[in-house]
């Protein structure tokens, strides 16, 4: 056999004789074998022991319709490989799409700082300039009233004006409960232009006060509980009387606060009565120089009231017409005319410690509260 014909015989698929391969030189056999191994061959033909190149062999394959066990396995493997290739291509397409969307989203953040500079900066974050002070954190319950943009006033920094909620004080003042008070709370006192107000607070037996010369009505007199009475210099005397039943004996009134109020007839509104805490006896007298006669007549009326405190009726003198009303803290008020007691309410019930109001003609009225 001619050696030049051996390559053609070797590449023929129908030729199965290998006797000429042993006769061929060893150097000439390596090159064709390497070329055959590199070229793809048909799998169906290879299962049946036939080596055929794939180029142009798909339509000419002799085992294309074979359904043997080996050919079925080859078909299944081809289907799996085709599905894997399709899945890999789909994943690559999705990955490319996600990458493009991520690039578009990543391009948006560089524009965010330009928008932040136009608005208000966040609290505690610097905008890049050293002369801007950090803004303090605002609580949720505080509402800012004014905000200055950092772009206009960078030297001063943002200014925050806040108004925290404040509790408004109630106009009611707590007072200790007393026998005359209806409750524990009383409304605040109203300011009234009363010309003469005299309050006598007693805890110990009452001190008899007698007129003495040299008293100035424009001054204030405070009397201690124990010791001699102070002396004052003035041109008008002062007349006072003890509040007890006896002239010099101990007081029969209970140990509560007593208030003596001198009120003119022209005052339409009554004074607000507030309880006072028990303390040392003191007398505060404030009046004008033109009303010293009113004080004198009031003291004389108290002297007459002391003598007739147990009597059912009190008749004033003809020269000084007056009316007296006894007011009980828990009972209805009663009033009397110029001739005597004429109760307006259903009944007149005096108590051991009543509140007495004395009206002195045109001069005014006196209220004694105990």
From Swiss-Prot:
DNA-binding region: 42-89
Pfam families per record: DM, DMRT-like
Annotated spans, Disordered: 1-27, 103-136
Example GO BP: cell differentiation
Location(s) in or outside the cell: Nucleus
Highest taxon listed in the record's lineage: Eukaryota
Stored InterPro entries: DM_DNA-bd, DM_DNA-bd_sf, DMRT, DMRT-C1/C2_C
GO cellular component: nucleus
Keywords attached to this entry: Differentiation, DNA-binding, Metal-binding, Nucleus, Sexual differentiation, Transcription, Transcription regulation, Zinc
Database matches in Gene3D superfamilies: DM DNA-binding domain (4.10.1040.10)
Molecular functions (GO terms): metal ion binding; sequence-specific DNA binding
Family: Belongs to the DMRT family.
Stated role: May be involved in sexual development.
Name used for this protein in its record: Doublesex- and mab-3-related transcription factor C2
Organism encoding this protein: Bos taurus
